[in-house]
């Protein structure tokens, strides 16, 4: 079985990686001190990456406030569920809001909307 984590944590990790990528891009710009154009370009690209991470953090914060809070049966801690199926943030227990999916193997494809005929 593949390693899963909660959707909120995945998006937060992506936003954090954007911050570090932005710093690395800006650091690369230091090596081009002789060329003002290249140095400025790398600094602006790094700043855009950090700005994008701020937007992602804001978006996941808004999304997190709308997430359904449930008590995980595995660890008895409160966690948030985005979509029909998700993982517990604390113990990675598969969670579902759909009674028809209880007992089935965890699959993130259950969150995708099915095409209606």
From Swiss-Prot:
InterPro entries: UPF0295. It is a multi-pass membrane protein. The keyword Signal does not apply. Belongs to the UPF0295 family. GO terms for cellular component: plasma membrane. NCBIfam families: PRK02935.1. It is found in: Cell membrane. It comes from the Bacteria. The keyword Cell membrane applies. It comes from Bacillus subtilis (strain 168). This is UPF0295 protein YgzB. The chain crosses the membrane at residues 13-33, 41-61. Keywords: Cell membrane, Membrane, Transmembrane, Transmembrane helix. Its main location: membrane.
